[in-house]
């Protein structure tokens, strides 16, 4: 098994104080992302998996499993803390001095690595979520709603082992970073990273702990919302009052359901990837809770110096036949309300990209196209711009957080109204899930179609855009419809619950 780089090349970089990656490749055409997770990490605490399926049917090239973080950063309100002993002591968090966004920016800088050309950016970095409420660190907003789930506002982990499955080549690359600030000699640092790689490669040779039969459907508890039916419709009417008064053009209220869920968390992810394949699929096990999702939408991406925001607004269900599907597409593209709502969010996307892009570089590369997913089709546009001098991955992410599709326009006033209309703090929902790559790039999706599991309770949240002529009953039903993919996954999770969930 060949390790890259050679020790001689590694030693030269180490002498210059450079962080480096040690990696090795293995043929893996029999492995799936799920089998990788089960063999390497058993879906235990402080592990994650990221996958992608575009158009509901085309699997993305790379899937990633991360584990054994050497540090975990998290934020609560106006304070942040870090655990640099995360491999050995899950409780060893120490408070950090300074503004949380400053401590995060410093950690991103500390975690920079010049990536080898043959590794994708996702092979190393900081992985996790920045919740909706992180915007309170940037904008002055009321912060008075109760927080019954009680999660950190943001958590990012830095895995010491990452496995990248290349679905095109049928191979897996196991990557371990070596950090120059560790104080180790070049020989010791190389040996430590190499041992982590080889341990993971040995784990790949074992059979995943799973049965092939599909088990049985298991009952889940009744879902209870933090709104009554009439209460949600009243919130929609109140939102329309603000629109008529000229405060806003659009706002996106949401409701959250809670239900008992006593099956293994990874069974829910396995069920979700089967029932609702999506461009951004993720499972994060943070120990005391899990974040599991199948999001359709980029929040912000920074790649090759280009910032991308991809607004999605306007929805129809998929047709039962190709003819019905085309008819529904034509109906969607003829719906003036849907088109007006999408245009507002396209303009908002232009503004968000423009906050961190060079003058004159912001442009839409796609406008009002239809993208099809497993259950629905959407109107989609794509906005890009070259990142300006002095801006970085974090400032680009904050320019788009939260997305207009989960807040409204104008964004700050819409968020104030959301705080008034909704009974509880949003938490993860409406924020971003993804990673800051070690090479300085970044890719986050919006935390939509996203569930939180904590204390055997499953939380699902969904919202809808309200405009001046919205029908309150239709808006209520839209939130119910958007929650269906996760409800269905929860109902079917028993099919995966016998074994093979860590």
Task: Please tell me what each predicted stretch does.
Residues 1-502:
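Extended alpha-helical targeting/anchoring segments
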């Amino acid at each position: 098994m060949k390790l890259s780089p050679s020790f001689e090349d590694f030693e030269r970089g180490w002498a210059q104080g450079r962080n480096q990656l040690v990696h090795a490749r293995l043929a893996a055409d029999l492995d799936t992302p799920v089998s990788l997770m089960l063999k390497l990490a058993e879906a235990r605490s402080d592990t994650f998996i990221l996958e992608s399926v575009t158009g509901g049917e085309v699997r993305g090239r790379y899937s990633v499993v991360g584990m054994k973080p050497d540090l975990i950063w998290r934020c609560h309100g106006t304070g942040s803390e870090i655990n640099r002993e995360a491999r050995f002591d899950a409780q060893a968090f120490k408070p950090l001095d300074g503004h949380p966004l400053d401590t995060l920016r410093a950690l991103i800088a500390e975690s920079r690595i010049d990536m080898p050309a043959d590794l994708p950016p996702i092979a190393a970095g900081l992985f996790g979520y920045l919740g909706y409420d992180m915007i309170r660190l940037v904008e002055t907003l009321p912060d008075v709603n109760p927080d019954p789930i009680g999660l950190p506002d943001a958590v990012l982990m830095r895995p010491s082992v990452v496995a990248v499955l290349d679905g095109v080549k049928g191979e897996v690359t196991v990557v371990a970073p070596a950090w120059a600030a560790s104080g180790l000699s070049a020989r010791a640092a190389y040996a430590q990273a190499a041992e982590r790689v080889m341990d993971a490669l040995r784990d790949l040779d074992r059979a995943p702990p799973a049965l092939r039969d599909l088990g049985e459907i298991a009952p889940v508890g009744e879902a209870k919302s933090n709104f009554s039916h009439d209460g949600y419709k009243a919130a929609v009417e109140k939102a329309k009052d603000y629109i008529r008064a000229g405060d806003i053009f659009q706002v996106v209220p949401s409701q959250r359901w809670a239900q008992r869920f006593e099956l293994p968390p990874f069974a829910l992810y396995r069920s979700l990837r089967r029932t609702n394949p999506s461009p951004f699929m993720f499972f994060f096990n943070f120990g005391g809770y899990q974040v599991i999702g199948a999001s359709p939408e980029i929040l912000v991406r920074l790649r090759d110096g280009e910032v991308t925001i991809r607004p999605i607004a306007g929805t129809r269900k998929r047709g039962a036949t190709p003819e019905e599907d085309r008819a529904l597409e034509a109906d969607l593209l003829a719906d003036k309300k849907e088109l007006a709502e999408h245009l507002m969010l396209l303009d908002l996307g232009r503004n968000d990209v423009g906050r961190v892009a060079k003058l004159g570089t912001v442009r839409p590369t796609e406008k009002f196209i239809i993208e099809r997913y497993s259950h629905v089709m959407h109107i989609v546009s794509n906005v890009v711009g070259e990142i300006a001098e002095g801006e970085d991955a974090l400032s680009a992410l904050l320019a788009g957080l939260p997305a207009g599709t989960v807040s409204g326009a104008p964004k700050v006033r819409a968020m104030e109204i959301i705080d008034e209309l909704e009974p509880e703090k949003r938490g993860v929902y409406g924020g971003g899930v993804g990673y800051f790559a070690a090479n300085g790039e970044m890719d986050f999706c919006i935390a939509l179609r996203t569930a939180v599991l904590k204390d055997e309770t499953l939380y699902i949240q969904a919202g809808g855009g309200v405009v001046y002529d919205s029908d309150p009953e239709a808006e209520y039903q839209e939130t119910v419809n958007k929650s269906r993919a996760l409800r269905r996954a929860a109902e079917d999770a028993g099919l995966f619950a016998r074994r093979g969930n860590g």
